[in-house]
Amino acid sequence: LPELRNKTDALEDKRVTFDNNELARSLFGERNGNLHLIEKKLNIAINIRGNDLMLQGGLPELDTAENLLNQLYGLLKDGYPIYERDVDYSIRILSGDHKAQLKPIFLDRVYIPSKKRTITPKSINQKIYIDSIREHDIVFGIGPAGTGKTYLAMAMAISSLMKKEIDRVVLARPAVEAGEKLGFLPGDLYEKVNPYLRPLYDALHDMMDFESGSRLIQRGIIEVAPLAFMRGRTLNDSFIILDEAQNSTPEQMKMFLTRLGFSSKTVITGDITQIDLPEGKSSGLIQARNLLANIKGIKFVYFGREDVVRHPLVQEIIDAYEKAET
């Protein structure tokens, strides 16, 4: 690492030892890919000597690397497989909070029986979000795209449905472009609402096979609908998700929140920096945040760029564009 060796700061050395050959190899990754990623992200050098790693770099980075390696090794001991994306998420977590514990985050599982798969949080805020949904009847997830707000809410909803904790899942989105007046659009109802709701269908079909999902939709057990279709209803024994809530008006948000019936949960997700409402219209999500933040039983969870769960190249592309624009 030329940048490392050219630094004028004093370089320090640390040795990290692992007692299990097989787990050490898993930790290092295929072709030592996990170690190369740690070198790149933390700007340190790592030399392998059997089960020992010799780390060289600045002291804060070495402390982070040692903490990271020991915690990842602990996860491997508990049977959690470590991939490069896990290393990447872990570096972000520990760089933001060196006291953070990875086990409670990565070993938390949302089980989806329909696909026999588990979905796990990848950041501290994602873990807080999942716990909040378990513990509260109304949860707001606010933050940028790609932070898992809708996906995790959907996972919790489908998991609850499969475990028969609820009878129905309702997924809603404001249809901003149509001003929620779908009569302006040609075609039948499905054709009218489908473009606005496609992202919700995509997330749904990622969690259950197409036939099962379609069958549940036809039976009304899973409902995907524009926000306007919630008016006048009371939803009992349901898990209700409002996506893109920043594009709801205050009237629509009030209408939506008062649909909540007995034994139901609702999760509202949105990004208050991406409001597409017509000029002069205020966001129902912003008003709800201002009015409801102190009500017991309602939880607000905020996500940041550090929670973005994407292909590493996507993050680099975003960074490159942001750099060019400043």
Place the predicted regions along the sequence by residue:
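Acidic, low-complexity intrinsically disordered tails
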Residues: 1-9, 326
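Flexible glycine-/small-residue-rich
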Residues: 18-20, 48-50, 57, 173, ...
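Short amphipathic alpha-helix segments
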Residues: 23-40
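Conserved helicase motor core of SF1/SF2 NTP-dependent helicases
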Residues: 113-242, 246-326
